[in-house]
Curated annotation (Swiss-Prot):
Disruption phenotype: Decreases the level of LYS1 protein. The keyword Oxidoreductase does not apply. One of its GO terms (biological process) is regulation of lysine biosynthetic process via aminoadipic acid. Residues 1-20 are annotated as: Disordered. The keyword Cytoplasm applies. This is Peroxisomal LYS1 stabilizing protein 1. Keywords: Cytoplasm, Peroxisome. Residues 1-10 have a biased composition (Polar residues). It comes from Saccharomyces cerevisiae (strain ATCC 204508 / S288c) (Baker's yeast). One of its GO terms (cellular component) is peroxisomal matrix. It is found in: Cytoplasm, Cytosol; Peroxisome matrix.
Length: 40
């Protein structure tokens, strides 16, 4: 995953999290998993 792709993922996940209250507890967990995964 490139830095640009990662940035898009992060933005999309946060935006989606704002729109759905049931998603706010779920999506940040995915975001953390993606963010803490080392890129090669």
């Amino acid at each position: 995953m490139t830095a640009k792709t990662k940035q898009s993922w992060n933005k999309g996940i946060w935006e989606n999290g704002k729109q759905g209250s049931h998603q706010q507890t779920f999506l940040p967990k995915i975001w953390v998993n993606i963010y803490s995964t080392p890129t090669s």
